[in-house]
């Protein structure tokens, strides 16, 4: 089993895009199999996602960090300016934090989160969105000081309307 001390967290580069896409898709398939249709999860395409991650890595205001072990990337996070209508200048949003299922429960997500939070100016408001049925993620974010602030939205994912909950940390 992997241990957090065997994992390095570093800024992502465009050459990481395909590996990030593979982790992204494996995580979605593992985490959302009870929430999203199998047809949608099986349709997720590495090359398409890699293009999105290449753009994210080069975006000026976005920070993408990769967690990797001796085999390669096992997790990543993406953080940038908060996109919500009620966001104040300087508010941040965690757009994504995903781990390959083989890294679940190893402490790598905790270390990624700590790295993100340690990189923020004290007092910065941070938000993120979680699918309503994703109890594992909600528990993880609560442990890191995030709370559901009552804001919800409906996003269509895989042809299905799904409720997302906003969690915030001040």
What does each of the following model-derived ranges do?
Residues 120-130:
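Conserved GNAT acetyl-CoA-binding A-motif
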């Amino acid at each position: 089993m992997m241990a957090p001390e065997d994992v390095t967290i570093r800024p992502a580069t465009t050459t990481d895009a395909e590996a990030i896409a593979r982790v992204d898709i494996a995580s979605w398939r593992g985490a959302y199999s009870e929430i999203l249709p199998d047809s949608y999860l099986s349709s997720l395409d590495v090359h398409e996602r890699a293009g999105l991650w290449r753009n994210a890595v080069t975006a000026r205001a976005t920070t993408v960090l990769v967690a990797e072990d001796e085999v390669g990337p096992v997790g990543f996070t993406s953080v940038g300016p908060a996109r919500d209508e009620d966001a104040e200048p300087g508010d941040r949003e965690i757009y994504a934090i995903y781990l390959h299922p083989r890294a679940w429960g190893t402490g790598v997500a905790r270390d990624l989160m700590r790295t993100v939070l340690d990189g923020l100016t004290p007092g910065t408001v941070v938000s993120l969105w979680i699918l309503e049925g994703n109890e594992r993620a909600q528990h993880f974010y609560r442990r890191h000081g995030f709370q559901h602030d009552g804001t919800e939205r409906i996003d269509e994912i895989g042809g299905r309307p799904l409720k997302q909950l906003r969690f915030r940390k001040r």
